[in-house]
Design a protein with these regions (language model features):
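The feature identifies polytopic integral membrane transport proteins across all domains of life
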Residues: 83-93
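Hydrophobic alpha-helical membrane segments
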Residues: 91-103
Length: 157
């Protein structure tokens, strides 16, 4: 149990640091580094924990991770009065299937067509799952998040 909690802590810390580093490269506002890191950490933590479910696949884990990070994105965008694109762009970084894309191209170049096709289809499924998770949460009405955070909306001019 202690080993699992230690792994969870390390996963959270590394995903937070990686997302903050990507926020720096992405030129996110300095005041938004910590919320950006929290969105990436939320998405990766849910992804990692979902993989422990019986029968869970990386596609399902990516979908649940995308749901979690987009929920965090919507909450932070209302609470911090900042566009959600700042948080979702940085927060998606840990979930992007970069290794899958790399291995798809590697197998293609090496002439391993069966492995290329299998890895390419899996990578495409993960990418679609992430996109669906983001779209589902972004389709929720904004008033829901304004009420959740306790604000009625942007200030009127």
């Amino acid at each position: 149990m202690i080993a699992f909690l230690w792994q969870l802590f390390v996963q959270c810390a590394v995903s937070f640091a990686a997302t903050v580093a990507f926020s720096l490269l992405f030129h996110a506002p300095r005041s938004q580094y910590v919320p950006c890191g929290c969105t990436g950490m939320a998405g990766w933590t849910v992804y990692w924990l979902t993989l422990f479910w019986p029968g869970a696949t990386p596609v399902l884990a990516s979908f649940t991770g995308a749901l979690a990070l987009t929920l965090a994105t919507r909450i932070f965008s209302v609470a911090r009065r900042c566009p959600s694109a700042v948080f979702v762009t940085a927060g998606i970084f840990p979930l992007v299937p970069g290794a899958g894309i790399y291995y798809t191209v590697y197998y293609f170049i090496m002439g391993m067509n069966d492995a290329c096709l299998a890895k390419g289809v899996e990578t495409l499924k993960i990418a679609v799952a992430i996109a669906l998770g983001i779209v589902l949460v972004l389709a929720l009405p904004g008033r829901l998040f304004h009420r959740f955070v306790g604000r009625e909306g942007p200030p009127r001019a």
